[in-house]
Amino acid sequence: IINNAVVFLPAKNLLYDATKDKGSRLNGNKIQTGNNTIVNGSRILASESQNSSKLWRNTPPAIERHFRSSLAYRLCLVAEGRFDGMMTLRPTWEWDVAAGNLICTEAGCDVKTQDGGNPLYNEKIPKMNGMIAGNPILVDNLLSYIK
């Protein structure tokens, strides 16, 4: 269980933090995820490789893809509502996403692994099967597209 989280981007002067059951903040101000639930046209943070047809049940959805290299920062941007969601459909080290996971969930997001499970931490192999985050309905809708 993650109880406290901080993601600091000193070059941007951005400090995201969260405490379990007490919400998420950006530079001390409460943040909340967006409310878009429609996959097509949604603004999703993902790498170019996520467009590969082998990852999707049919054709990839028509998302507006954006990229930031840091998975923690992607999660924080979704938490503050600047993007509708984020996804990485490849194995993900837990230390890259643990803080962002709590910041996201405390801002109202649902965070799931690529197979729809809840992320687990402190596992023997500290890697999880991808990650998808956004408001709960959008996450469910995105998961319905994934193989």
Give the location of each predicted region:
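DPxDG-like acidic metal-binding loop motif
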Residues: 1-27
